[in-house]
């Protein structure tokens, strides 16, 4: 199963009440990307909706918040375990791979063995890169098309 380019709410599998969220809908460079509860308010919802664009002839994607239009990027391009994800005008490309479970995916940095990881259920926990752990559900994500919300 693969992900179709489009716009999604992306929820962590381990912490099902936490979505990928651009903190405070802040368009400033290096604004933290966090796990946050669903925020269905007119001013805050677009920062939890992510448009996936597939790069031509690849299985690589960019992820961009609907509002504001900031891309997911690894802070300072520091592609190491524990690095924070931030909003940026420049994307860090990712691969989105089925985890073998119905509707569950791992978002990875291509060819590096690092995946987007939500370390805690606490609201506003920064999403970081973590070494891929096939047994860890906090590295798994469910994608819900915004047309289905």
Curated annotation (Swiss-Prot):
It comes from Clitocybe nebularis (Clouded agaric). Keywords: Acetylation, Lectin. Lectin specific for terminal, non-reducing N-acetylgalactosamine (Gal-NAc)-containing carbohydrates including N,N'-diacetyllactosediamine/LDN (GalNAcbeta1-4GlcNAc, LacdiNAc). Specific also for carbohydrates containing N-acetylglucosamine (-GlcNAc) or N-acetyllactosamine (-Galbeta1-4GlcNAc) at the reducing end. Agglutinates human blood group A, AB, B and O erythrocytes with a strong preference for group A. Agglutinates bovine erythrocytes with a very low specificity. Binds carbohydrates bivalently, which is required for its biological activity. The keyword Acetylation applies. Changing residue 55 to R: No effect on sugar-binding, but loss of dimerization, hemagglutination of human group A erythrocytes and toxicity to Jurkat leukemia cells. This is Ricin B-like lectin. Contains a single ricin B lectin domain with a characteristic beta-trefoil fold consisting of three repeated subdomains each containing a more or less conserved QXW motif. The N-terminus is blocked. Residues 110-112 are annotated as: Involved in dimerization.
């Amino acid at each position: 199963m693969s992900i179709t380019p489009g716009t999604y709410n992306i929820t962590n599998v381990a912490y099902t009440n936490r979505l990928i969220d651009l903190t405070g809908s802040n368009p400033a460079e290096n604004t933290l990307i966090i796990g946050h509860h669903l925020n269905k308010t007119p001013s805050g919802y677009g920062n939890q909706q992510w448009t996936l664009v597939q790069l031509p002839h690849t299985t690589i994607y960019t992820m961009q918040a609907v509002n504001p239009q900031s891309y997911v990027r690894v802070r300072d391009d520091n592609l190491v375990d524990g690095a924070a994800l931030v909003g940026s005008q420049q994307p860090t490309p990712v691969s989105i791979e089925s985890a073998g479970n119905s509707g569950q995916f791992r978002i990875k940095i291509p060819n590096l063995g690092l995946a987007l990881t939500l370390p805690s259920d606490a609201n506003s926990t920064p999403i970081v890169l973590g070494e891929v752990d096939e047994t860890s559900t906090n590295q798994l994500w469910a994608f819900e098309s915004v047309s289905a919300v």
